Amino acid sequence: YYSGDLLMHISDGVLSPIVVGIGWAIALPALAISVRRLRTDQVGTYGVVSAAFFAGSTIHVPVGPFSMHLVLSGIAGLLLGWGALTIVTVGLLLQALLIGFGGLTVLGVNISIMALPGAIMGMIGRHWIKQVSPKKRPWIGSLIGGGTILISAILLYVTLSTTNTALMPLAKLVFLGHIPIAI
C-alpha cells in the first residue's frame, strides 16, 4: 500500500470496509451539494483550478522516508467555494485512474480527507476575507491553505489509526510530515 511516492492518497485494500463505507457516506452527500451549486458561468475557472490541482500533485517534496505533494484544495475552496469539492473530486478520480494515486474503492475516503476540508475551509475563508482589509487577505489565504492541509492530515491519521493499530506509527509519521507542507 505504500509505494514510497505518496501517502496523502490512501490506496485500495488498506482500509477496512467499514471505514471505506463511512468515507462514501460522507463524500456522496457533500458531492451532491457541490454539484448542485456548480455555476455554468464558472466552467473556465473550474477547468483552470482543476488543472492546477492535478499539476500541483505532481510536485513532490521529500519528507523523511516518503514524499508529499501540493494539495491546493484550500486555495481551490477559496476560489470556488463548494464547487471546489467537485473539481478536487475530478482531480482525485483522474489521479487514481491515470497515475495510480489512491484507488476507486477508497475514493470516498480520499474525497472526505482532501476535498471536503478544502471546500469547507474555503467557504470559511471566503466569508472571512470579506471582513478584513486587502492587506490581510494574503494571510487569510495562507491560513486557509495551511489549515486545510493540517485538517486533512488529522483526518488521514484518524482514518489510518482506526483501520489498524499497526498503522498508527505510519499515521503519526504522515501527520508530522504534513506540518512542513502546511507551513
Segments from the language model and where they lie:
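Hydrophobic transmembrane alpha-helices
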Residues: 1-75
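Hydrophobic alpha-helical transmembrane segments
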Residues: 17-21, 43-48, 85-89, 107-112, ...
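Hydrophobic core segments of alpha-helical transmembrane domains in multi-pass membrane transport
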Residues: 20-32, 52-56, 119-122, 145-157, ...
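Small-polar-interrupted transmembrane alpha-helices in polytopic inner-membrane proteins
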Residues: 50-54, 84-96
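Interfacial aromatic-anchored transmembrane helix boundaries in multi-pass membrane proteins
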Residues: 58-67, 90-121
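Alpha-helix C-terminal capping segments
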Residues: 76-83
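Short helix-perturbing small/polar motifs within transmembrane alpha-helices
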Residues: 111-157
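C-terminal transmembrane helix-loop-helix hairpin of multi-pass membrane proteins
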Residues: 140-150, 167-183
